[in-house]
From Swiss-Prot:
It catalyses: 7-aminomethyl-7-carbaguanine + guanosine(34) in tRNA = 7-aminomethyl-7-carbaguanosine(34) in tRNA + guanine. It comes from Blochmanniella pennsylvanica (strain BPEN). Keywords: Glycosyltransferase, Metal-binding, Queuosine biosynthesis, Transferase, tRNA processing, Zinc. This is Queuine tRNA-ribosyltransferase. Gene3D superfamilies: Queuine tRNA-ribosyltransferase-like. The active site is at D89 (proton acceptor), D264 (nucleophile).
Amino acid sequence: MPFQLLQTDGHARLGRLICNQGIVDTPAFMPVGTYGSIKTLTAKEVEASGTQIILSNTFHLWLRPGLDIIKLHGSLHKFMSWNGPIITDSGGFQVFSLSKTRTITRKGVGFKSPIDGHLVFLTPEKSIEIQHDLQSDIVMIFDECISYPNTWDYVKKSVNISLNWAERSRLRFDTLHNSNMLFAIIQGGMYENLRDMSAKELINIGFDGYAIGGLSVGEPKKEMYRILSHICKLIPTNKPRYLMGAGKPEDLLEAVQKGIDMFDCVIPTRNARNGYLFVSDGTIKIRNAQYKKDTSPLDGNCDCYTCQHYSRSYLHHLDCCKEILGVRLNTIHNLRYYQRLMEELRQAIKTKSLQNFIDIFYKRVNRI
């Protein structure tokens, strides 16, 4: 089995995901490398953070540099010198993020290229073929990521189209004799009955894992957690569960507690570029004047390169001067913070002390 469930603590799960390019310990956080890189970091620096798997984007790599360039190197892994597993988004998120320039039909989605404005058309089959050429360890089906809010009628129509695309994705994946994994994406907006319909049909088709899409798109937190609790009960226990796009530390804790195994999000890297840094007691804005003369490390509990070698004062200086080194050091730290958090969550599940860990976490981060 590609997924091994090793231990539970309530609904939380400790597991291992066995990919062609390596093993991923779950719960796992996957940093986002849209264009084949985690912004500002080398592959070795990403690996040093404790990252075991990264996410890249089918749609954007298809447009630039193009499959012909990546295939010259043999695979996306070799192109970016990453030795671990890679999961690729199918392009479904671009159906959401490029909504002003796209047209949805049952056949697929037409887009205006964000690079030069020329028209491109992406079908479920084409998305699977691109991911096959990239040699993604985990391939995602093509779907529509539904915006919030939306009407029940629109969401039902969208779910039906996505289910059609799921069947076509499954068929094309199988005809390519792909040895990697294929994950489905459960949609349905904030409507439990439509989530039920989506999950039931996808489970009937059969996939290696099940992602939860259409969350963290602007809905209230209580709505996200409500839908998350509902869906986790629907997914077979022997399959990995992947929450797409949600990534604040408290979201990770709540979702792990509900039974989620995998996460991706741009928050740690994007926040790092904007000078917002995660520390044991919460978050800090490193540009604030209070850090100008602060000679202490960014986080005394952190073992990352940044915290072992530089002070808050120096990071404050780099941020004020807009030095690229500051962005790199911030990113190294934030990514390590997230991977340390996942390591601590896995250890808490292993020792059946997750609730105690979460209680301590919330008490600690409220100090700032």
